[in-house]
Amino acid sequence: MKISSFISTSLPLPTSVSGSSSVGEMSGRSVSQQTSDQYANNLAGRTESPQGSSLASRIIERLSSVAHSVIGFIQRMFSEGSHKPVVTPAPTPAQMPSPTSFSDSIKQLAAETLPKYMQQLNSLDAEMLQKNHDQFATGSGPLRGSITQCQGLMQFCGGELQAEASAILNTPVCGIPFSQWGTIGGAASAYVASGVDLTQAANEIKGLAQQMQKLLSLM
């Protein structure tokens, strides 16, 4: 076919035009075309629910149900608590030790510790007294320990036991009450530092240690 004869062939034109659409024929078939305004109106008329609206509704319903449950629980809790009487436990009275039990404890402690102190004092001599007086008269030394036990018996026990403990504490050792030999920095320390008649002092202390044996027999 020549190009000139192809160009001269005319395509069929639309046979009718009506309002919103145009109708024509192409290759023996009818073709219609809607206008853009009508297409827009058709889209606007469609009703579709937005995606996710049903899920959001379920979540809101669930949260509302939980909130109502929590509120109901709190109301019941306060309602029940308001009807229950408040019970305050009665204070437990402090158990004070009786004088008898305290006295027995003092006796027991003296019975356990005095024998050890008595044994150490029975071996005392002038040299040991001068060299170790500070150690013997502090802490758990035999002078401090034995005097402390005698003071406990004198203060918290009665009868013959109290009288015997008091006699031991007030017995002079080289003119100084035995109770002062269990401390340092006083008259006993000054006497030991002088070095005078330490043998006599040691012997008198040993005599008091033997006298403590009577305390043990009275317990």
From Swiss-Prot:
Compositional bias ranges of the Low complexity kind? 8-32
Location of the region described as Disordered in the Swiss-Prot/TrEMBL record = 1-37
The UniProt record lists the keyword Mitochondrion? no
Major site of localization recorded for this protein = membrane
Q: Which domain of life is it from?
A: Bacteria
Keyword terms, alphabetized? Cell outer membrane, GTPase activation, Membrane, Plasmid, Virulence
Q: What else is known?
A: N-terminal is important for export, C-terminal is indispensable for virulence.
| Record protein name field | Outer membrane virulence protein YopE
Q: Which organism is it from?
A: Yersinia pestis
